[in-house]
Amino acid sequence: MKKLLVSDYDQTFYLNDEDIEKNKIAVKEFINKGNMFVIATGRGYDDFMKKKKQYNIEYDYVIINHGATILDKEDNIIFETTMPNEILDSLKSDLHIENAERYFCCSLLESRIEFEHKNLTKVHVKYNDLEYSNEIQKNLEEKYGDILNIYYVSGNSIEIISKNIDKSKSIKLLSEKIGINQEDIYTIGDGYSDIKMIKDYNGYAMKESVQELKESAIGQVNCVSELLEFI
């Protein structure tokens, strides 16, 4: 039976240059056996494509922007989910980007655009202070929690996508398109935006994962190549 493995990228498929080479070899063997491999990352298109080219990463599909965009290996957009345009002005105000160290928005295959562009798939904001970042995130969740997913990602950064999508929902859309059953889907990750896909499928945690993800996982592994030894 064909299997599908979906892996987060940062701190999962990529830990360091040595680790990613082992993972690439294991994935190639997995694909050659008739299985499918998907990267699911919070990165936008340009940021991920730089890594794909740098490390010559092989995959069947890639899910970017925490699930908001799915591409095939020829970079054709298979699915995309945007945030409601009518909330973008108030969201920009509530993010207090004048106090941010940096921010950018993503749409389609564009990774560095402004709020005014509309039809946004993701917003990234980094602040100078973690306490301030946490306060912004809490306020956003109270006001927009029914229409937006707000993720703490790293450092003092938060990223925002539509509530209608996440990595798990994108996997479901993709699995229906390619005809793979839920019981044949395996997932691995380490961060907050990975938790739902770990819960919904045969999910494994990296050893250095957030605690909530570890509690939801079937087991823990050191790397993707280790997981591929027994699935």
Where are these regions (language model features)?
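Asp-based phosphoryl-transfer active-site loop
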Residues: 2-19, 39, 198
